[in-house]
UniProtKB/Swiss-Prot annotation:
GO molecular function: ATP binding; single-stranded DNA binding
Listed name of the protein: DNA replication and repair protein RecF
Keyword list, A-Z: ATP-binding, Cytoplasm, DNA damage, DNA repair, DNA replication, DNA-binding, Nucleotide-binding, SOS response
Location(s), subcellular: Cytoplasm
Chain's role: The RecF protein is involved in DNA metabolism; it is required for DNA replication and normal SOS inducibility. RecF binds preferentially to single-stranded, linear DNA. It also seems to bind ATP.
Length: 366
C-alpha cells in the first residue's frame, strides 16, 4: 500500500497543507523545529488515530484552533481508499471511504505504518509501558480483534480499580464477578500477545543474525506476572492469581496483576540485551523494525508504510546500509533529515520536500 496524498488542517504548526507523495521514497529536509516530524506524525495519526509523541490531544490541534482534520488517499490492492480523521474536544470522528466508523478498531488497519524514531532506542532499556505500547500498536494493526479485546479488558480493569477505590468494605462476591470478566478478556489479550511475539521473534532473529554477521541470536520473552504453562490454561491461571491477590489489591486499591503489568525482555546470545552495548541495542531495534515490516506483509499481504524520523543520524554506516538494503522497493518510505550529506545510494524515483516554518515545498535533488 502507499499514501498518495494527505490534506492537513490545523495540525501542530500547519494551518493548511496538501502534499502528494511518491510511492517510493519521500524525504523531508529542513532545520530543526520547522515541522518535519509533524508531517510524519500526521501520517501516523491518520493511520492509528493517536500520536507517537504525546498522549494529550490538545497538543496536536494548532494554537487558537478548536479542531484538526486529516484526509488521505491510500492505494491498496483492492483499490483507492479515502481516509479521514477529525479531532476536537468532543473526541475523534473517523471515516473510511466517506463512511463514519462506529469504533476505532473498525478504522485502524486500513493503513498500516511502521515508525522508526530516535525514541525507539529506549525500547530495550525504557519502562515496561513502552514495550506494551509497542505490542499494542503492531498487533492492533494486523489483528483488529486484539484492539477490541484490549478495550474490553481496560474497561473492566477501570471498573475494578474504581470499585476498589470507592469503598473500605469490599464485597468479595462482587469483586469475584469482576475477576471473571477481567480473566475472560485478559486471557484473550495475553494469548494474542504470545502468538504475536512468537512470530515477531522468528522474523527479528533472522534480521539480527544478518546484522551481526551470523554471530548473535535474538530471543524475545513475554514476561507475565501470571504463571502461564500453556495457552489453554491462561484464564484459569489469571483467575487464580487474582484471587490470591485480593488482600493486596484491597489494601492498595488497584489491580496488581494482569496484562496491563506485563513486559517484554530481549536476549542477545542468552544475555539480557539491556546490559548489551549501544551498538547491539541499535541492531536489535533495527531488527525489530525490519521484522515489523515483514510480519505486517505476511499477515495483510501488503507492505506497510515506513516512517523514518531522523534515525539515519543515529545509525552508523553499516546499519544505515543494512536498513536501506532491507527496504523493499514496494515499501513507501518517509524520511526526515536535516541534510542529505550522510545519505548515499538513494534511489532515483524519490521526492524531496523542503520544510520551513510550517510550509512544505517540493524541490529537485541536485
Amino acid at each position: 500500500m502507499w499514501l498518495e496524498k494527505i490534506d492537513i488542517q490545523h495540525f501542530r504548526n500547519y494551518s493548511e497543507a496538501s502534499v502528494s507523495f511518491s510511492p517510493h521514497l519521500n524525504i523531508f529536509l529542513g532545520r530543526n523545529a520547522q515541522g518535519k516530524t509533524n508531517i510524519l506524525e500526521a501520517i501516523y495519526f491518520l493511520a492509528l488515530t493517536r500520536s507517537h509523541r504525546t498522549h494529550l490531544d490538545k497538543e496536536l490541534i494548532q494554537f487558537q484552533q478548536n479542531s484538526l482534520k486529516l484526509n488521505g488517499i491510500v492505494h491498496r490492492h483492492s483499490g483507492n481508499l479515502p481516509l479521514e480523521i477529525n479531532l476536537s474536544n468532543k473526541g475523534r470522528v473517523t471515516k473510511v471511504n466517506y463512511l463514519k466508523q462506529a469504533k476505532l478498531s473498525d478504522y485502524i488497519g486500513h493503513m498500516t505504518v511502521v515508525l522508526f524514531a530516535p525514541e525507539d532506542l529506549q525500547l530495550v532499556k525504557g519502562s515496561p509501558s513502552l514495550r506494551r505500547k509497542f505490542i499494542d500498536i503492531d498487533l492492533g494493526q494486523i489483528k483488529p480483534v486484539y484492539l477490541s479485546d484490549l478495550s474490553n479488558y481496560n474497561h473492566v480493569l477501570k471498573q475494578r480499580n474504581a470499585y476498589l477505590k470507592s469503598t473500605d468494605k469490599v464485597d468479595i462476591n462482587f469483586l469475584s464477578v469482576l475477576d471473571e470478566q477481567l480473566a475472560d478478556f485478559g486471557a484473550r489479550v495475553i494469548k494474542h500477545r504470545l502468538e504475536f511475539i512468537k512470530q515477531l521473534e522468528e522474523e527479528a532473529d533472522g534480521h539480527h543474525s544478518i546484522l551481526s554477521n551470523q554471530i548473535e541470536r535474538l530471543k524475545i520473552s513475554y514476561e507475565s506476572n501470571i504463571p502461564i504453562q500453556n495457552s489453554k490454561d491462561i484464564r484459569e491461571a489469571f483467575l487464580t492469581t487474582l484471587n490470591q491477590n485480593h488482600k493486596r489489591d484491597i489494601f492498595k486499591k488497584n489491580t496488581g496483576v494482569g496484562p496491563h503489568r506485563d513486559d517484554l525482555k530481549f536476549y542477545i546470545n542468552d544475555m539480557n540485551a539491556s546490559f548489551g552495548s549501544q551498538g547491539q541495542q541499535r541492531s536489535l531495534i533495527l531488527s525489530l523494525k525490519m521484522a515489523e515490516i515483514a510480519l505486517i506483509k505476511k499477515v495483510t499481504e501488503e507492505f506497510p508504510i515506513l516512517l523514518l524520523d531522523d534515525v539515519m543520524s543515529e545509525l552508523d554506516n553499516h546499519r544505515q546500509l543494512k536498513l536501506l538494503e532491507s527496504i523493499d522497493e514496494e515499501v513507501q518510505t518517509f524520511m526526515t533529515t536535516t541534510s542529505l550529506d550522510h545519505l548515499s545510494n538513494l534511489p532515483p524515483n524519490l521526492k524531496t520536500f523542503l520544510v520551513k516554518n510550517g510550509t512544505i515545498y517540493e524541490k529537485q535533488v541536485d
